[in-house]
Structure formats: structure tokens, C-alpha cells
């Protein structure tokens, strides 16, 4: 029997697959469309509501020729109808200006409504490379 944490882990992977495929339709199926959803991209301020979040992803996808976000060091905690996933993201982006690689620490919060898990919060903060932290 599949555990709730396994379901959340699979949905979280679908989220990152949709990001890497720049698939807005996939994002629409994963995100809750409730008014209380929130998102913070690295270097951005808080975005509130599904419409604004969808527009933010659209802008990110339009600016990238190729985007890959790979989660690693994943931790899933299920607390009743709420699940919290923390992970590191390895982000590769290719634009007309060139390519970038960075890392971020992310928290994704899922809510179970009517028997279905939906993403209600995504927060990713850039991680400085260890060499940049040295005095």
C-alpha cells in the first residue's frame, strides 16, 4: 500500500518535471488554485494567488531557452492534511545571454483537499557556493 509520503514525493517530482519541461499546464494540475497559495522564487518577493504565480512561471519560462531544476537531499513530512517537502535544487538555465548554474534551498508545502494533494506554497532561496562564504 502506498504511503502518503510516497504520494507527496511523487507529486513533488512531477512539480520539478513540469518546471524543467516549462510546462504551464502541468503546473496548473499540481498547484492549488485557492487564494491562499504563495510562491517565492530566488531573489523575488512574495507572490500571492494562483493567477500571479502562474504569470511568474510564464515569465521564467519565456526567459529561458532551457531550464532544468533537479531536487536533491529530499525530506518529506506529512502532518495530517498538510505535507512539507524540503530539498536543495540544482538549477541550470540557458538564455540568449548565456548559461547559469546555481543552487537553492526549497520548501514546498502541499495540502490534501477532497483526497487530492495540491501544492500551496513554494519558496526557493539561492545558496551561495561554499567558496563565496570564506573570508
Q: Whereabouts are the PLM-identified features?
A:
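A beta-strand edge to alpha-helix "cap/lid" segment located at domain peripheries
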Residues: 1-32, 36-135
Amino acid at each position: 500500500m502506498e504511503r502518503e509520503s510516497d504520494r507527496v514525493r511523487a507529486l513533488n517530482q512531477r512539480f520539478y518535471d513540469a518546471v524543467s519541461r516549462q510546462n504551464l499546464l502541468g503546473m496548473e494540475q499540481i498547484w492549488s488554485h485557492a487564494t491562499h497559495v504563495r510562491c517565492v522564487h530566488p531573489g523575488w518577493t512574495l507572490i500571492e494567488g494562483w493567477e500571479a504565480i502562474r504569470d511568474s512561471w510564464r515569465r521564467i519560462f519565456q526567459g529561458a531557452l532551457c531550464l532544468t531544476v533537479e531536487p536533491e537531499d529530499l525530506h518529506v513530512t506529512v502532518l495530517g492534511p498538510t505535507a512539507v517537502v524540503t530539498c536543495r535544487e540544482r538549477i541550470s538555465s540557458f538564455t540568449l545571454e548565456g548559461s547559469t548554474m546555481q543552487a537553492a534551498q526549497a520548501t514546498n508545502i502541499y495540502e490534501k483537499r477532497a483526497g487530492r494533494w495540491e501544492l500551496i506554497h513554494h519558496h526557493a532561496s539561492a545558496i551561495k557556493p561554499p567558496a563565496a562564504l570564506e573570508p
